[in-house]
Amino acid sequence: MGGKLSKKKKGYNVNDEKAKDKDKKAEGAGTEEEGTPKENEAQAAAETPEVKEGKEEKPEKDAQDTTKPEDKEGEKDAEAAKEDAPKAEPEPTEGAEGKPEPPKDAEQEPAAASGPSTGGDAPKASEAEAAEPAAPTKDDKSKEGGDATKTEAPAAPAAQETKSDGAPASDSKPSSTEAAPSSKETPAATEAPSSTPKAQAPAAPADEVKPAETPAANSDQTVAVKE
């Protein structure tokens, strides 16, 4: 009995050793298999933060891209405003050039009519000069007076009397003398604000009413000289 038992024990022992070896091999394989997933998991865990960082960088880039168009739009708006500013600046000059032109026509029309009635011409002249912006200063008027007296030598007395009052004569002024002040008026109109013409406008009619007070003999003299 004991021998059988011993054999059995040995057999069991042999089997147990084989089974243990198998178990060890299986456990080793299992640990290796378990180790590889762990390594894979570790690599995946290491990759995930990098991927997250890459994803975070992408939104930052997108945010920068979105801000860049906004900046570009802002720059475009600024450039457009700058372009509009120079465009808006010449407008007063154009307006100033356009405004002095009607006075020229108004002054030439009385010349065509030979201006017998100084009273009718005075209001026209007052309206014409009132329409002019911050325009001819006293120096410009004196220059106009000097040029006109040179060109209108025969009618010097009447011209001097009327021009000494600071108003235009009933006779037509040469277009050359008017063109020069008009060019001078454009910078004055751009530099001077709109308040200056309003301030000077009331003073102009007061000076311009004086030609109407001058005797009509002056106008008769001018007509006689022209004839």
Swiss-Prot record:
GO cellular component labels: cell junction; COP9 signalosome; cytoplasm; growth cone; nuclear matrix; nuclear speck; nucleus; plasma membrane
UniProt biased composition (Basic residues): 1-11
Segments of this protein annotated with the region Disordered: 1-227
Modified-residue entries (Phosphoserine), positions: S164, S170, S172, S176, S195, S219
One biological process term in Gene Ontology: supramolecular fiber organization
Compartments reported by the entry: Cell membrane; Cell projection, Growth cone
PANTHER family for this protein: BRAIN ACID SOLUBLE PROTEIN 1 (PTHR23212:SF0)
Protein name: Brain acid soluble protein 1
Record gene name: BASP1
